[in-house]
Design a protein with these regions (language model features):
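Short acidic, glycine/serine/threonine-rich loops at helix termini
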Residues: 13-17, 99, 126-127, 180-182
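Alpha-helical segments flanking ligand/cofactor-binding loops in enzyme cores
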Residues: 75-76, 128, 158
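Short amphipathic alpha-helices and their capping/turn segments at secondary-structure boundaries
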Residues: 35-46, 153-167
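Solvent-exposed alpha-helices and their adjacent loops that cap or buttress functional pockets
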Residues: 46-48, 79, 106-108, 162-163
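Core alpha/beta catalytic barrel or barrel-like domain that forms the active/cofactor pocket
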Residues: 4-14, 54, 88-90, 114-115, ...
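Active-site core of metal-dependent hydrolases
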Residues: 80-152, 177
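Active-site gating/metal-coordination segments in enzymes
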Residues: 1-84, 136, 142-146
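Short acidic/histidine-rich active-site segments
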Residues: 140-141, 166-182
Length: 182
């Protein structure tokens, strides 16, 4: 089991960060970076369990102010610690490209980034662009056929593997239980 730290938000930052940070009411260093680095170096919430992965998200709402702030904090924590990053993305809006751009601006080595949910797309140009920039493709969510049918997922993985991208794909699924609302 590998613990992660980060913030999973499609829009805003959690309330405790809303007024604290560069240029805000309480103008101090970004507190999310401090939190993430502490989780990695000392442990999460004084448990002694150290995070070994950073996580952020960008989905259909796009690069909102909150999403960008979290993503930049994740990037800065990565630069400070070297811990890899996984990003929840929306393949249909090609948000993996936006995530790569923001993280690269923060100095992130894109070969340390998994672009999650890349497997929701059969757009080979999009997927090759992500991989060619250095990131791993999260070919996940097998079984969530309403996002992309199983056969299309398998075909996409097979084609990319034949094209030399086998080492740039992480095969997984993104659900561990039954969801009655899917």
């Amino acid at each position: 089991i590998v613990a992660a730290t980060g913030i999973y938000s499609y829009n805003e930052v959690p309330f405790q960060f809303r007024y604290t940070g560069r240029g805000l009411l309480f103008d101090v260093a970004e507190p999310m970076v401090e939190l993430f680095v502490k989780d990695i170096r000392e442990g999460i919430a004084d448990t002694g369990v150290k995070a070994a992965l950073l996580k952020c998200a960008i989905d259909e709402p796009g690069l909102t102010d909150g999403v960008e702030r979290v993503m930049r904090a994740v990037g800065q924590a990565h630069v400070e610690t070297g811990v890899p990053i996984t990003v929840h993305t929306n393949a249909h809006t090609r948000s993996g490209l936006v995530a790569q751009k923001v993280l690269a601006q923060e100095g992130v080595d894109l070969s340390k980034v998994v672009i999650g949910h890349s497997g929701d797309s059969a757009d080979l140009d999009y997927l090759r662009t992500l991989a060619d920039a250095g990131s791993y493709l999260g070919m996940d969510r097998f079984g969530l056929d309403f996002l992309l049918p199983f056969d299309a997922r398998v075909n996409t993985v097979a084609v990319l593997a034949k094209q030399g991208y086998a080492e740039k794909m992480v095969l997984a699924h993104d659900t561990g239980c039954y969801f009655d609302w899917f």
